[in-house]
Every structure is written in structure tokens, then in C-alpha cells.
């Protein structure tokens, strides 16, 4: 498990602003557009599908309420004084779809490769007792996270090896990118 760096801080540091727009949410998941603004135009930097772990650990409940109310996951957990780490499940490339291109204000061309990462986010009070909080599948704008050489295409990976929440998250993200 690697120490989790907060995506919202990375976006703000690199692009000068950070906002989150929850596009869709229910009790088990949410789709969020993490974006920066430029001359009044929103540019998606990360499109994220979150599949929340059930049940939520008591140590995370207050922060979870704020997250479910539309706040940034990493920022909220950090502001609550919680520690985070992420366990990367897979990394790949996938083609940019029409919807992702539109969210990126057409700064990413349709069919160009984008970086995709799926990880399990753990959070808690003590480093040795972090609890699973969610599985998160992210697609990144190339200016935020470039496609690494040697990454395999998502369609070339063996999805039969993934657990059901990972499969669900990847499928939901692919639909949102289309």
C-alpha cells in the first residue's frame, strides 16, 4: 500500500483551482467530475467512480456524511484528521470518449488514450488499523496524469481476475467516459 496523495491538492497546485461536481450518486456509489476552471470554463482533470465499502467504519462515519453531501473525498478525510493509503488494483489506458472529451472542454480528443487507475482507498485514525473506504476508478486528463509508456490497454487486461466491485467500477467508468 502506498501513502495516498490527495488528488484535489494536486489539481489545485498544477492548474490553479479545484472543484468537485457530483454527477450521480446513490447509497453505494458516486460519479464525480474533479475539475479546474480556466477563463470561466470547467476542464475535467479526473473523472472518478467511487464504490463505497459497506459497512462504513465508525471512525469514518462523520467524514462519510460530508463526502455523501458532495464534498471531496481526499480533502474531507484529510480535514477530519484521518490517515489514508491506496492499494492500486490496476493501471491501464483507455480511449477518450465523447462524454469525457466534453467534460474536458474538448481539450482531450476523442479516441486519444487516457490514463486509468483503479485502487482501494483505506482510511482511519491509526496507520496500522486503516479500514477499506472505497474502490475508486479514475480516468485522468493527460495534462494532469500522462499515459505512461508500457501501460496495457484496458481491453487487453484479464477482468476475470478482478473482484466484483472492481469490475463494477471499471464498467461504470467506461460508460461515463463513452
Predicted regions and their residues:
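Composition-driven recognition of glycine/serine/threonine/acidic- and proline-rich low-complexity segments
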Residues: 1-178
Amino acid at each position: 500500500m502506498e501513502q495516498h496523495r490527495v488528488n484535489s491538492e494536486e489539481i489545485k497546485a498544477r492548474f490553479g483551482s479545484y472543484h468537485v461536481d457530483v454527477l450521480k450518486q446513490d447509497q453505494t456509489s458516486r460519479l464525480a467530475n474533479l475539475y479546474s476552471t480556466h477563463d470561466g470554463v470547467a476542464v475535467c482533470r479526473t473523472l472518478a467512480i467511487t464504490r463505497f465499502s459497506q459497512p462504513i467504519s465508525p471512525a469514518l462515519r462523520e467524514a462519510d456524511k460530508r463526502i455523501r453531501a458532495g464534498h471531496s473525498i481526499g480533502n474531507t478525510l484529510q480535514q477530519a484528521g484521518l490517515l489514508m493509503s491506496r492499494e492500486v488494483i490496476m493501471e491501464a489506458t483507455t480511449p477518450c470518449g465523447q462524454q469525457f472529451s466534453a467534460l474536458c472542454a474538448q481539450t482531450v480528443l476523442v479516441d486519444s488514450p487516457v490514463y486509468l487507475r483503479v485502487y482501494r482507498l483505506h482510511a482511519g485514525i491509526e496507520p496500522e488499523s486503516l479500514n477499506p473506504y472505497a474502490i475508486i476508478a479514475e480516468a485522468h486528463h493527460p495534462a494532469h496524469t500522462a499515459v505512461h509508456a508500457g501501460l496495457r490497454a484496458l481491453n487487453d487486461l484479464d477482468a476475470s481476475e478482478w473482484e466484483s466491485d472492481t469490475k463494477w467500477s471499471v464498467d461504470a467508468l467506461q460508460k461515463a467516459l463513452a
